[in-house]
Amino acid sequence: MKNIFTLTFILCSFLAFAQKKEKVKGSKIVKMEQKEVENFQNLEVEDNLEIFLVKGNECAIEIEADDNLIEYVESKSAGNTLKLSTSRDITSSKKLSVRVTYTDDFKMLIAKNETNITALSDITLDNITFKTYDYAKLFLNAKTKMFTLMANDKSKVELNLKSEKTTIDLSKSAQLKALISSTSMKFDLYQKSKGDIEGDIIDLDLTLDNNASLDGEKLVAKNAEIKAEGYSTAKIMVATKVIINASGKSEIQLYGEPKIELKRFTESAVLTKKPSK
């Protein structure tokens, strides 16, 4: 039995070592290199790459990095998905970025680890989804018919959006700062996520739970349905009608002069009516 435990420990240690990337530092001499890629609809980015998005007629990538690091920037195609990552643990560099050209077929971007994603121009697509994890950062302007954002872990997103239909889901400790104009928006915040939102929404479906917080004092919704639970907090302005479901120790600060319907109001929930500024 002791031999089995010893063998298991050695095997686990070997696997952990095998999965650990070799560390490398950049030369500080920057070089650019273009790489051919297959057409893609989805983009997955990992590690600590800086990504710049630009729209074009054909899919392409251009790497700008320290000359000894370019070979470690990997691009792999799997079906309709392009995956970008590094094969080494790059501890320092003068430049480590990839300019990604997407087309009208672009559907989804997934960002993980410490990636930094910036759209160099407005993303104008019918339907696009962004998913962020770990410590990823996302900066973009978008004009779409349907827009979906799912931010998780400690990722941060800054967004300027015009969309007909918007779906946003924040969880864990994700943060969103945004200016949004949308016909309809479903907005869910969970755990310790935070939203700082301005803009105009016609129909808003808002859900908050756990310790989530929303600062929407400058977000004007014509109609809203709000569900607040746990220790969540929300500041929001509603113009015409609001339906409220509040429980736990949730707190809602309501601005504007809407018709208020208390559908459910239990436990230690607090609703405070605030004057419009």
Can you say where each PLM-predicted feature lies in the sequence?
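Intrinsically disordered, low-complexity terminal regions
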Residues: M1-K277
